[in-house]
Amino acid sequence: MKKCLLSSMAILLLAGCASASGDTQGSALAGEWICHSIPTKDRLTYDRLDHFILKSDGSGALRGISSIEMDKETTIRYLTKGNVKWQNKNDVLSFDFLDRSMVPAHSKNAAKAIKQNKTLQQQEKEQLDDFYCKCNDHVEMPIELKQDGNKLILGKDYATCRRVTENDKDIKLLNKWFNTKK
């Protein structure tokens, strides 16, 4: 699960894709993006839905939901958000976190199971520790911007990203989760 959260964090860090140096590829990335990664069948990776706001001055913001559905009533879920400085050179996105946070938002069954199981409590502690580790303050990943400029493929996870649209259903879902957890 450590790898899952680190991968999720890498995707979340996309929040700063336009280059401060004004390179045209970086400028093409400026705007709002929704990225989605579907978990593997072995449940070793999280289903991720991330929203990035990429500013042309090299600053950015992000928020997202990472989850694994264990069964219909048991979902392990984390809400993440943060601010970054970013740069894109030669199809490699690099970013530095300015701040970040992760909040558990598990289903009631998952929260109950974690509360009653020392091993699960330790795993969650390790995940949160990994998330906040200074070693994750700087991340680099390869990117591929599709020719029309409205689609993006990120890193080894091959998360697919698209530009945010008006009345976007994924933005509404994120708003619901982040407004609930205030």
Task: Walk through the language-model features, giving the residues of each.
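Lipid interaction determinants
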Residues: 17-89, 94-182
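Sec-dependent N-terminal signal peptides
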Residues: 4-14
